[in-house]
A protein has these predicted regions:
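Bacterial N-terminal signal peptides
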Residues: 12-22
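Acidic, metal/ion-coordinating pockets
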Residues: 26-246
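Bacterial N-terminal signal peptides that target proteins for export
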Residues: 2-14
Length: 246
């Protein structure tokens, strides 16, 4: 883990979680279970490899680093090997990436350049999660434009949309041979950004609402895989808070 973190340098991909999910196809064959006389259905197994990365910041010191080595220089061969060998790579984009400048009045304000996004796609990133406390740094218009810029670069934005209902909607990232859904939510307060559920926003679903949403997905398809990505916790702390454990 230490080596991986150092290779990404200032990009701040804080965590790599590689998930190998066994997915079963629907074409099974009957086999007898030893000693029982019963026939069980067996399925060929396919594996889906999903990498979930942490914060990806494209401002401050990272902006300076890009000016020195270019955005491709932020990715080491070992990171490329991990990302490009995976089916999907989901990263938390910790800044709006837009030419729009409508700064929200808050302590830390970030912004990345849209022309950097295609490089993220080239290096294997497929989905960018916007359900965090910095996606709104350039206002609601900057948030919507960030979504559009992500799509133009060939990736899929998660956790933000034209209103809260759309922002919180689960996203199907893989349908076959077994559905994989991603549910995202920001569980931190937004600084000087009013909660207006009918306006462009990031997903801020409550814990109770998240539980019900996951339960509905599970009832609809008990074989699906559900990934819940939460932006929460206390910065610079390595242990979960009591509320997170609950």
């Amino acid at each position: 883990m230490t080596k991986r973190l150092s290779t990404v340098q200032a990009v701040r991909l804080c965590l790599f979680l590689a998930l190998s999910i066994p997915l079963f196809s629907s074409n099974g064959t009957g086999t007898e279970t030893a000693g029982t006389g019963k026939t069980q259905q067996s399925f060929p197994v396919e594996t889906l490899r999903i990498v979930v990365a942490g914060d990806l910041l494209l401002d401050r010191g990272v902006r300076q680093r890009i000016g020195q080595v270019g955005i491709d220089g932020l990715f080491s061969p070992s990171v490329d090997t991990l990302f490009l060998s995976s089916d999907y790579v989901i990263a938390n984009l910790e800044c709006p990436v837009t030419a729009i400048r409508e700064r929200v009045y808050k302590r830390f304000i970030f912004r990345g350049e849209p022309e950097w996004l295609p490089a993220l796609y080239r290096h294997g990133i497929t989905h960018l999660n916007l359900a965090n406390n910095h996606s709104i740094d350039q206002g609601r218009n900057g948030l919507l434009d960030t979504q559009e810029q992500i799509r133009k670069a060939g990736m899929v934005p998660l956790g933000a949309s034209r209103n809260m209902e759309e922002a919180a909607r689960p996203v199907l990232i893989s349908a076959r041979p077994r559905p994989v859904w991603v549910v995202t939510s920001l569980r931190l307060p937004l600084e000087n950004f009013p909660y207006l559920p009918q306006k462009p926003s990031v997903s801020q679903e409550s814990a109770d609402s998240l539980v019900m949403r996951v339960a509905r997905l599970r009832r609809a398809d008990r074989h699906c895989v559900i990934l819940v990505l939460l932006h929460w916790g206390w910065e610079h702390h390595l242990r979960a808070l009591p509320g997170q454990r609950e």
